Amino acid sequence: ILSCLVGSEMCIRDSQGSEKAFELNDQKMLRNALPDDRRYTYEIREILKLIADKESLIEIKKDYGRAIVTGFMRIEGHATAFIASDCKHLGGAVDSESADKASDFFDLCSDKNMPIVSFVDTPGFMVGPDSEKEGAVRRMSNLFKSGSKLVSPLVAIFLRKGYGLGAQALVGGSLHKPAFTAAWPTGEFGGMGSVSYTQLTLPTIPTGLI
């Protein structure tokens, strides 16, 4: 991959071989890829492997900004970049490090004119005193800045949670940015999760409500 990051915008597309040389995974397995119970986590990398052509998935920066998974893959022979939430780390919340990772990746894809598929499952941005000490406002704002400058076509796939500004940031800074948007049957949308909203609006939560 490193040898493909310098030069023409076609070099990353060519790094995974001929577009005619591909083999699909069994797409029927995607029907049961996500748990029915929204409280259960799942392995996002296994879903990505099912969607991608066989042996075409390449992940980058795996151990950095772990709430976000980034890399390249082919879909029916067509090279594309992907960015995905990892619900097993911070519940998929976008922290400062993940925001940096996503921002840098958007910049890379825009520079190389790589189409992007964004798989979203996030409760939003990680907030709180610790996050603020890490420069969250500045670093998360940079993600919106990178999204606003994105020239590559972007497709948004909402796997589960699509809440708040964090979800918008992962699809280019606006829900109107993607060229196409779709959702799994488990998709949820809103300014924040229903539990968080209830906790904010009710002084005491009736027993059994949550």
Residue locations for each model-derived region?
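Phosphate/diphosphate-binding loops
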Residues: 129-174
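A glycine-rich phosphate-binding loop feature that marks nucleotide/adenosyl-phosphate handling sites
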Residues: 16-28, 66, 119-126, 159-167, ...
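Non-catalytic terminal/interface segments that mediate subunit docking, oligomerization
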Residues: 41-145
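Single conserved hydrophobic/aromatic residue that forms the stacking wall/gate
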Residues: 1-12, 199-210
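Short coil/turn connectors at secondary-structure junctions
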Residues: 77-79, 112-115, 150-154, 176-178
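Generic secondary-structure signature for well-ordered alpha-helical cores
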Residues: 8-9, 13, 35, 39, ...
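Terminal amphipathic helices with adjacent charged low-complexity linkers/tails
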Residues: 8-9, 13-43
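Mobile "lid/hinge" segments at catalytic clefts and subdomain interfaces of large enzymes
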Residues: 8, 176-200
